[in-house]
């Protein structure tokens, strides 16, 4: 247990926790990072084959990963990076499944992040002013611009400057090349009046080496590593953050209560600043427990809306094949940068103004289509048509905030006696109409590129696992349940008025300003872009503001 005093406690060590810790430590602040999971080595975290495959089988048979196995990333990464659902349970209504992916280890879900880095535009930040749904954000792109730029430079993000209103340009290095089949699709789409194809923006695929064992997109390979190098950071792993400690008049937090998961002991840790980066649902549970705490008074939420307006991105997927333009040889063996990654892929970035088909759009807000061709092909002898290359398109769209979609505390408690989160979330008519439009544009784009849509199991032979893969949510025609896209957002939104938001424009709890809420829970709307870069930019901005003398 740490004995030295700390000036800040950061809860969570993933994408936002790493940036919070780096920002504070580089400014001279002594930081304690609280992480519920273990501190793994890079070799332990990444794993290897066939051991990872054996762990997947065990995770499925034991029930450890019953829900998380629905996500394609589970089949790509070491299953050890997905929390045991029996140890960290949650509940849902029977008719409202929610697929919560939990990354409980130092590095959190940054170790399984796909590495796409997109900025939000004011079309998203101020969408409510345009259509009247919900509230606009209290910040704009200009407020985050410098923080976006600093992070893009630090991470050496790949991408073009495309000059799109719906996708602001960043400080990027050269984009990764399209595969030959992607080049063919891009050329075919140039004949379309309203379907534009751009290089995706993000990280390239990680190639582990002794010099770079961690993925640069992960906090252990970037922000957290930089923070630890200052000598002002200590990581307390294996401890679950339960709730805030409050002062007598409930105006400020004095620290947090954590649970040592080895023995269940509750420990009080004190610091003048608390930064909450535990991921949306875990952070909402922490805040709900803190709000209701009888022994310490709890903090006040004037809006009485904590936990409400939970969102994810609504998504749907189509697999297809196109004639190979590069023979049967593996492109990835010839060029490792051609592996599927945040930068090794493409976007059809429709944004808030998708092309109209058959009259006015039957939904509000927007979406993008992310895709790739010839970046994840199995060996040619496993393909049903070995002279074709495989592709996919995945839509991810903005979800309207709904008062009914929420996280509450269940009457059921976990092994440490803490109420588990109860998640109530379902798609509405707007999301259903958006998904139908996604299908129309997917079909159109793939047809223009000479592709043929088929179920993945009709494209690839999968000995032994075909029955499992065929039943995955990603294989179904419609939209998977909320949580599937691992972009859960909202529940403690930013705002300009304490009566309709949980945190202010600097991410401070309205009635407890030395607590910052900076992960996805602070989002006012979901936007349509991949959220992680914006989460990190919000975190950097909030932590820099907290360091100013007037906030001491």
Regions found by a protein language model. Give the residues of each.
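A glycine-rich dinucleotide-binding beta-alpha-beta segment and adjacent secondary-structure elements
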Residues: 198-215, 237, 242-249, 389-394, ...
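Conserved redox-cofactor binding core of oxidoreductases
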Residues: 57-84, 89-99, 104, 114-119, ...
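Beta1/beta-strand and adjacent pyrophosphate-binding region of the FAD-binding site
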Residues: 2-16
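FAD cofactor-binding and catalytic pocket of flavoenzymes
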Residues: 83-102, 106-109, 113, 119, ...
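Conserved hydrophobic helix-helix packing surfaces used for dimerization/oligomerization
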Residues: 8-10, 31, 515
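A conserved FAD-binding loop/helix module that cradles the flavin
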Residues: 525-543
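Conserved N-terminal glycine-rich FAD pyrophosphate-binding loop of Rossmann-like flavoproteins
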Residues: 38-64, 103-112
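Glycine-rich loop(s) and the adjacent beta-strand/alpha-helix scaffold that form part
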Residues: 23-26, 30-55, 243-247, 256-330, ...
């Amino acid at each position: 247990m740490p004995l030295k005093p700390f000036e800040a406690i950061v809860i969570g060590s993933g994408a936002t926790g790493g940036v919070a810790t780096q920002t504070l430590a580089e400014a001279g602040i002594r930081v304690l990072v609280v992480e519920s999971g273990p501190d793994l080595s890079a070799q332990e975290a990444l794993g290897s084959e066939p051991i990872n495959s054996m762990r997947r089988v065990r995770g499925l048979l034991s029930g450890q990963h019953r829900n998380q196995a629905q996500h394609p990333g589970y089949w790509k990464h070491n299953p050890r990076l997905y929390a045991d659902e029996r140890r960290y349970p949650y509940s849902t209504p029977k008719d409202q499944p929610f697929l919560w992916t939990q990354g409980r280890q130092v590095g959190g879900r940054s170790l399984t992040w796909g590495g796409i880095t997109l900025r939000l535009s004011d079309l998203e930040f101020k969408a409510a002013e345009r259509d009247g749904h919900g509230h606009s954000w209290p910040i704009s792109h200009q407020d985050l611009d410098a923080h976006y730029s600093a992070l893009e430079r630090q991470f050496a993000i790949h991408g073009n400057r495309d000059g799109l209103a719906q996708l602001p340009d960043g400080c990027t290095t050269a984009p990764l090349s399209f595969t030959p089949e992607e080049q063919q699709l891009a050329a075919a789409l140039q004949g379309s009046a309203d379907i534009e194809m751009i290089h995706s923006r993000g990280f390239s695929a990680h190639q582990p080496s002794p010099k770079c064992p961690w993925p640069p997109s992960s906090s252990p390979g970037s922000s957290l590593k930089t923070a630890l190098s200052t000598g002002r950071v200590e990581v307390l792993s294996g401890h679950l953050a339960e709730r805030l400690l409050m002062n007598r008049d409930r105006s400020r937090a004095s620290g947090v209560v954590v649970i040592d998961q080895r023995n269940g002991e509750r420990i009080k840790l004190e610091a003048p600043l608390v930064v909450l980066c535990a991921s949306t649902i875990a952070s909402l549970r922490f805040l709900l427990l803190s709000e209701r705490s009888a022994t310490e008074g709890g903090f006040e939420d004037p809006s009485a809306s904590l936990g409400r307006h939970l969102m994810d991105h609504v998504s749907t997927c189509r697999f297809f094949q196109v004639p190979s333009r590069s023979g049967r040889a593996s492109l990835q063996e010839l060029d490792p940068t051609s592996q599927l990654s945040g930068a090794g892929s493409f976007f059809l970035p429709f944004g808030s103004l998708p092309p109209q088909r058959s009259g006015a759009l039957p939904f509000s807000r927007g979406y993008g289509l992310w895709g790739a061709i010839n970046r994840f092909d199995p060996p040619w002898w496993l393909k049903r048509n070995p002279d074709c290359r495989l592709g996919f398109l995945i839509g991810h769209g903005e979800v309207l905030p709904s008062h009914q979609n929420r996280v509450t505390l269940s009457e059921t408690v976990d092994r440490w006696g803490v109420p588990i989160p109860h998640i109530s979330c379902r798609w509405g008519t707007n999301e259903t109409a958006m998904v139908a439009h996604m299908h129309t544009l997917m079909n159109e784009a793939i047809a223009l590129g000479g592709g043929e849509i088929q179920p993945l199991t009709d494209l690839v032979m999968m000995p032994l696992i075909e029955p499992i893969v065929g039943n995955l949510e990603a294989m179904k025609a419609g939209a998977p349940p909320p949580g599937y896209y691992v972009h859960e957002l909202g529940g403690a939104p930013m705002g300009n008025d304490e009566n309709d938001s949980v945190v202010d424009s600097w991410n401070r709890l309205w009635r407890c300003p030395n607590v910052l809420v900076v992960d996805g829970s602070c989002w006012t709307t979901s936007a349509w872009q991949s959220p992680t870069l914006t989460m990190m930019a919000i975190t950097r901005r909030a932590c820099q503001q907290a360091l100013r003398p007037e906030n001491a």
